[in-house]
Amino acid sequence: MSLSFCGNNISSYNIYDGVLQNPCFVDALNLVPHVFLLFITFPILFIGWGSQSSKVQIHHNTWLHFPGHNLRWILTFALLFVHVCEIAEGIVSDSRRESRHLHLFMPAVMGFVATTTSIVYYHNIETSNFPKLLLALFLYWVMAFITKTIKLVKYWQSGWGVSDLRFCITGIMVILNGLLMAVEINVIRIRRYVFFMNPQKVKPPEDLQDLGVRFLQPFVNLLSKATYWWMNTLIISAHKKPIDLKAIGKLPIAMRAVTNYVCLKDAYEEQKKKAADHPNRTPSIWLAMYRAFGRPILLSSTFRYLADLLGFAGPLCISGIVQRVNETQNGTNNTTGISEILSSKEFLENAYVLAVLLFLALILQRTFLQASYYVTIETGINLRGALLAMIYNKILRLSTSNLSMGEMTLGQINNLVAIETNQLMWFLFLCPNLWAMPVQIIMGVILLYNLLGSSALVGAAVIVLLAPMQYFIATKLAEAQKSTLDYSTERLKKTNEILKGIKLLKLYAWEHIFCKSVEETRVKELSSLKAFALYTSLSIFMNAAIPIAAVLATFVTHAYASGNNLQPAEAFASLSLFHILVTPLFLLSTVVRFAVKAIISVQKLNEFLLSDEIGDDSWRTGEASLPFESCKKHTGVQPKTINRKQPGRYHLDSYEQSTRRLRPMETEDIAIKVTNGCFSWGSGAATLSNIDIRIPTGQLTMIVGQVGCGKSSLLLAILGEMQTLDGKVHWSNVNESEPSFEATRSRNRYSVAYAAQKPWLLNATVEENITFGSPFNKQRYKAVTDACSLQPDIDLLPFGDQTEIGERGINLSGGQTERICVARALYQNTNIVFLDDPFSALDIHLSDHLMQEGILKFLQDDKRTLVLVTHKLQYLTHADWIIAMKDGSVLREGTLKDIQTKDVELYEHWKTLMNRQDQELEKDMEADQTTLERKTLRRAMYSREAKAQMEDEDEEEEEEEDEDDNMSTVMRLRTKMPWKTCWRYLTSGGFFLLFLMIFSKLLKHSVIVAIDYWLATWTSEYSINNTGKADQTYYVAGFSILCGAGIFLCLVTSLTVEWMGLTAAKNLHHNLLNKIILGPIRFFDTTPLGLILNRFSADTNIIDQHIPPTLESLTRSTLLCLSAIGMISYATPVFLVALVPLGVAFYFIQKYFRVASKDLQELDDSTQLPLLCHFSETAEGLTTIRAFRHEARFKQRMLELTDTNNIAYLFLSAANRWLEVRTDYLGACIVLTASIASISGSSNSGLVGLGLLYALTITNYLNWVVRNLADLEVQMGAVKKVNSFLTMESENYEGTMDPSQVPEHWPQEGEIKIHDLCVRYENNLKPVLKHVKAYIKPGQKVGICGRTGSGKSSLSLAFFRMVDIFDGKIVIDGIDISKLPLHTLRSRLSIILQDPILFSGSIRFNLDPECKCTDDRLWEALEIAQLKNMVKSLSGGLDAVVTEGGENFSVGQRQLFCLARAFVRKSSILIMDEATASIDMATENILQKVVMTAFADRTVVTIAHRVSSIVDADLVLVFSEGILVECDTGPNLLTHKNGLFSTLVMTNK
């Protein structure tokens, strides 16, 4: 055959009837538009004209979409598909002719090239934003439309119709070209780039002008969106450089938390307005979420429907292909009467065409499916960000009583943030399945009926009858889930208390008691988890068993009830449909489970959002301007309006200009006035009543009174933290009579600086804690730190004031934390300063320095209004105004002179106490507590430095090793799956259960493969031999036995996996709790509380409920995938040839993905913890944040942390989509190669059907493998974190002596012998005590003192073996304490700590958690601690409720309870560590006498709060640099004028 365009027949070139009457010339005419476009566009593309014409140079390639962008891409893809069909049709038609006719397919080839060029050209024009170049495309579509229309008309005139494939293709192309032409006309209409005088200029998107935005999914073209092509750069670059936060940049504006918060808030407020009209109705969060995020969910659902409908192309194509192979096998295919013109029916019945259509259908299905996943994930992330913002906004408005009275705990808030928001996010991920699954099932049943007739209804009936069981199981799952969450919350609350009070628990040897309490709650939680695991197993079993039962019922019924034999095409198309039905049935339990969790989460969220809030404080934050008259009267300055919505931002450069203001007139000097005030915490009785006070402007007001009289509550009531039952708090619009306007122009006259009684610090640097968001002023900062005596402490820190002091300031002492909080209040340039008992944790020396330098000089020189709550009555002489409190009421108000005149008895009482305090001040020669704090700080810093140094050394060693290794080794380590962690998890469940799981899984999937192979043999036998009834009974019996075995094994495997996971969770939590409880105290000093708590909350939740179902799904899908590859290879061995390149491609995709995924996962983890800690910090420091009016600043910080975490998670999700799209496309390639190999080489239609069946489902299996493997890798991070704590070294609780060998009443005498004692805090640190030798006689009262870092506190800890005694020994009553079991030692000694700690429960539990004491003994202890009357007044007495942290008692009362706790034990040895620092002077003197009386015959070791308290001691131990330098009575030591003790006394006078 000669090669020519129109064929070798001369008549083919005949144009006598006109050029358009010749089909060849008409086809040639269709080449013109394509040649035109290629001729115009190629120079532009190659020369780069478009890119050089860009008016805006930015870093992203695609930043602009012309109108109709997505429609253009969709139409172009459709046109390319039609061109492929046209090429195929032309080649087939040409093969039926005697000579070659290039005109049949050459224009189609050129059209394909031109269409591809058009979209590339369009993409470049969008990139350059040069729309005038679109004119070439407009002309192209016009010419293509005209030429195709001419061709279609000629076909119509020739009598062709829809039955002719070429006519149909031409008609479709006319429509597509016309639509593309309309798109171009629309662009001209909107952009006006041609034919109009004023072209419309379009600015680039705002996000893409920001170089920090690198998440490009919303901005790239449709092809890149569908394939995540834009992610290639990030995925590949991860091999060269780890992905960091800079690499992923910021979120686009539409995805930021603040944007989505506004949407959700508006929707929720609308629901609140509707609910307000119906008293019994609560606002619906569900409707609010739908209003805010409903549209993207509908879009995702549309994608899901399209994907599900395309999924049914698989069974139909299998049926057609197997039917063609069967006809070929039986020789029944009709090949006679072939026409040169290919009909549509012939084309669609061709086996190869069906294979290609199946391939394209799979590509589209997987593209739509991944698009659906992405949209739901993006929407879920947006929802989570909005919910976090709503929760945080609510936290900032929470009523203080909710937290202090135990109605809402920190653990509950953490659960809302860490668990409930994630539950809702995951539910949104699965949401489209709720309405997609029913449609998928119905469509499957309809197609099954068309294939098998009424027998298909039997299988459908099985599904319908068993469906109610799924509902029953889902109901039980909801009940189990609810009880599990309740027990989990209770367990976390107890765990949180243990972690906060771990030092006290260890010193009192109570850790096992509290551990047992947690374990008891854990047992209850595990019982609920067992029920949850059982019903989860049944749900998984039903999902696996229902399809097998349905297939069995369908085929057995068809075998006996139908008159026709079961053909391979019917059988395997039906099996494919049943396999499609597996997915919705499998997801059903998962969706139901997450729906249940979401319902519970919404209930909790709704309760939280509707909880009580603080009252309106518009009097302090109102928008109104201040009265102008007062400003003009006193300052002569122009009036100013203050924006109350802005966070505190003060100008501090005028500090040195501040001068003392003139005292205002008596009638104008009231800053705050409370009239007839009555306040309460929550809905309880009034805490404060009959409050009528005034706070003078620019003066020092002191509030004094006994412990628990309501001093702190009064401050909080003024700040609006308490509920106002009656009366008013009036903040006067006072003037600012400042000589200098510059000094006060930025000071908010309602602004308050507040130092709470309970110190609160940020997890930030010292400088950031002091400045607290205000601009840094070096002179003011130095003045503040000097006034608070902080500079010596700062000098001890490794990085000075740039050192991060940790969450909640856990690496600082109480006094150091208190002084930083006071420094924060002093630094702020506010009108009013509230200081709540700032001296409580300070010794007298520091207190006096703070009073003189900080309050009297720094604050009063600046003439600021100061309200001071204190027990230090010696400072009353400095007060301009005094408020005396008693039993929640104001006892007296006025100046000291007024009170002297009006209440002589009160004045004389104060005078007595003040004289005592003055005497104590004169005697106090050293700041002993300060030295203790600084020594403790130095020790902690040494510990951290040593730890950091060791880590740095390890990292350097690793880096050196990495440098020595080649690149392949480095990449192997980065891509390594955490198999060791997986093995540890699996072995935690027990080797027997692990073996049973593996064996049952292998056996189950072998049986499933046997079922399908049996069916292939059965149908092939019928197809070839038309076997009779006897053989049919044989096949039915075998099929039934195999299906029954498969159903039984499904039950066994589901139960085994869940039980193994439950056992592993039980063991891991038990080991973690015991390891933490038994850990050394330095571990808690160097590890943030939030980090430890996260192991018990989020990580334990993952191990409990997420890993088992993921593990089951992973093993199932992996074995199914391996089974599929094996069966395809068996059916068509030639497939193995194609499997090699496909396997190589899959390997490299995985290789690149895993590195990037690991980096992104680490970013997600690392950005999640700061977010959780910020919520925890805010909840703990709520009163401080609100007092400073810094809510806006903290909100902004929360939004930044949320966006940072969300962008990491979004990139991680996009990377998963990147992977799945590629694995899906590889799966489609497997289907294509398997189909062509089956069509070409197989002679057995049953095996062809079997191979196609497994090839079709392998795409699902590959996706499940990848998704579950990725999920498991993420979830194993929780196991890895838990395991990292399990490797921690525990304290050595064992001793060489057996507890039974220790005398029952030891120590009875209280004799202490210290022999050559050497102590250190860690093995790599220097000793803090060196060769100490001392002897303490029974019953002696011993005082310990020394300079900073001298080691005196280390000795007290050495008595309890809280530090490492590496040499020497301590002998108590003849027994070396190093030989004693640790629990025995600590349980026989008593200690009173500086920081008071109470636990939730009862007063009885806090005094005697071991339940060893009688009520009389407990009442005696309370009476000694001056608490008996107060406890008797409480409901329940000894059984009265104590809330978490003892928040329903004042700090002083909590310390008194701690003293009573020590009295209950009545050990012969008592150690007092600054025990009276938080109580008033009168109570302290009483307690000192009580200690001397109650412990008169016992040994008392005191870490001196005042030197005066140990001068009269029986023995004084003086330490210097870890060495005991002096040991004698106080008076004797004072006789040695050159001695250290005397020197300390003299230098501090």
Swiss-Prot record:
Residues that span the membrane, as ranges: 31-51, 73-93, 102-122, 133-153, 168-188, 302-322, 351-371, 424-444, 456-476, 532-552, 572-592, 991-1011, 1035-1055, 1128-1148, 1246-1266
Subcellular location: Membrane
Residues annotated as domain ABC transmembrane type-1: 297-597, 994-1274
Record flagged with keyword Transport: yes
Domain of life of the organism encoding this protein: Eukaryota
Residues annotated to bind ATP 2: G1346, R1347, T1348, G1349, S1350, G1351, K1352, S1353
Known glycosylation sites: N9, N326, N330, N333, N334, N1025
Cytoplasmic side, ranges: 52-72, 123-132, 189-301, 372-423, 477-531, 593-990, 1056-1127, 1267-1549
Bias (Acidic residues): 951-966
Keywords for the protein's UniProt record, in alphabetical order: ATP-binding, Glycoprotein, Membrane, Nucleotide-binding, Receptor, Repeat, Transmembrane, Transmembrane helix, Transport
List of residues binding ATP 1: G705, Q706, V707, G708, C709, G710, K711, S712
Main location: membrane
Domain ABC transporter: 665-912, 1312-1546
Topological domains, Extracellular: 1-30, 94-101, 154-167, 323-350, 445-455, 553-571, 1012-1034, 1149-1245
GO cellular component: plasma membrane; protein-containing complex
Ranges where the record places region Disordered: 944-967
UniProt GO MF annotations: ABC-type transporter activity; ATP binding; ATP hydrolysis activity; sulfonylurea receptor activity
SUPFAM superfamilies: ABC transporter transmembrane region, P-loop containing nucleoside triphosphate hydrolases
GO biological process entries: potassium ion transport
Topology versus the membrane: Multi-pass membrane protein
The family this protein is said to belong to: Belongs to the ABC transporter superfamily. ABCC family. Conjugate transporter (TC 3.A.1.208) subfamily.
Functional note: Subunit of ATP-sensitive potassium channels (KATP). Can form cardiac and smooth muscle-type KATP channels with KCNJ11. KCNJ11 forms the channel pore while ABCC9 is required for activation and regulation. Can form a sulfonylurea-sensitive but ATP-insensitive potassium channel with KCNJ8.
PANTHER family cross-referenced by the UniProt entry: ATP-BINDING CASSETTE SUB-FAMILY C (PTHR24223), ATP-BINDING CASSETTE SUB-FAMILY C MEMBER 9 (PTHR24223:SF173)
Subunit comment: Interacts with KCNJ11. Interacts with KCNJ8.
Designated name of the protein: ATP-binding cassette sub-family C member 9
Origin species: Oryctolagus cuniculus (Rabbit)
